[in-house]
Swiss-Prot record:
SUPFAM superfamilies linked: 14-3-3 protein
Source organism, top-level taxon: Eukaryota
GO cellular component: cytoplasm
Gene3D superfamilies from the UniProt entry: 14-3-3 domain
Family, per entry: Belongs to the 14-3-3 family.
Name of the protein described by the UniProt record: 14-3-3-like protein D
Source lineage: Eukaryota, Viridiplantae, Streptophyta, Embryophyta, Tracheophyta
Organism annotation: Nicotiana tabacum (Common tobacco)
Matches recorded under PANTHER family: 14-3-3 PROTEIN
Stretch forming the signal peptide: none
Length: 249
């Protein structure tokens, strides 16, 4: 579906919400892209920012899930030495990867051109820089060789820039600061294979938030405690994996 040229910001917002209700996330992305373009000179509201994130997260989420399934089937076919199937699966995987690359390129362009330059508040800067790190990390998940190295370096730069602002301007219990720590630590664990660094980062974020839990406002309590639970789940999983590897060694 082509997005009409003459839509206002309010119409884009309404249609994006409509597409979300209908679970048509590719169209939701198009409406939010247009909203960003028509409101280029002003910052997005928190609602608009969250809708943009939800739209892209759903589109990229289904593609990442598809890629994992196809890659796992590819490994099975290689194990069975089924050459004809391997060729077909590889070709199919490269199509999924091409779509993944396009989606990441789309949001990264919007972040660099509009959203990061126009972000005034510390909270929005962290939100968009974290988002930039996330989409470079999704590229690093499937790219190989030099492209993977570059995507990982770009991820690190974005997360580091976000972290510098988050530590200076956001409370340890702030859901955006916690979400950044969660994703940054996952990057260390999954992409850089630096499990000790991943654990120490997640542990520090969790403990700093616990220490200030009584300062949490009603509105962000649910978001913050949910992310803290995810940090703790990862810590439990990672430390047991590290223990198993040590036992095997």
């Amino acid at each position: 579906m082509a997005v009409p040229e003459n839509l206002t910001r309010e119409q884009c917002l309404y249609l994006a919400k409509l597409a979300e209700q209908a679970e048509r996330y590719e169209e939701m992305v198009k409406f939010m892209d247009r909203l960003v373009a028509v409101s280029a000179s002003s910052e997005l509201t928190v609602e608009e920012r969250n809708l943009l994130s939800v739209a892209y997260k759903n589109v990229i989420g289904s593609l990442r899930a598809a890629w994992r399934i196809v890659s796992s089937i590819e490994q099975k076919e290689e194990g069975r030495k089924n050459e004809e199937h391997v060729v077909l699966v590889k070709d199919y995987r490269s199509k999924v990867e091409s779509e993944l690359s396009d989606v990441c390129a789309g949001i990264l362009k919007i972040l660099d051109q509009y959203l990061i330059p126009s972000a005034a508040a510390g909270e929005s800067k962290v939100f968009y820089l974290k988002m930039k790190g996330d989409y470079y990390r999704y590229l690093a998940e499937f790219k190989v060789g030099n492209e993977r190295k570059e995507a990982a370096e770009d991820t690190m730069l974005a997360y580091k820039a976000a972290q510098d602002i988050a530590l200076a301007e956001l409370a340890p219990t702030h859901p955006i600061r916690l979400g950044l720590a969660l994703n940054y630590s996952v990057f260390y664990y999954e992409i850089l294979n630096a499990s000790e660094k991943a654990c120490s980062m997640a542990k520090q974020a969790f403990e700093e938030a616990i220490a200030e839990l009584d300062t949490l406002g009603e509105e962000s309590y649910k978001d913050s405690t949910l992310i803290m639970q995810l940090l703790r789940d990862n810590l439990t999983l990672w430390t047991s994996d590290m223990q198993e590897q040590m036992d095997e060694a």
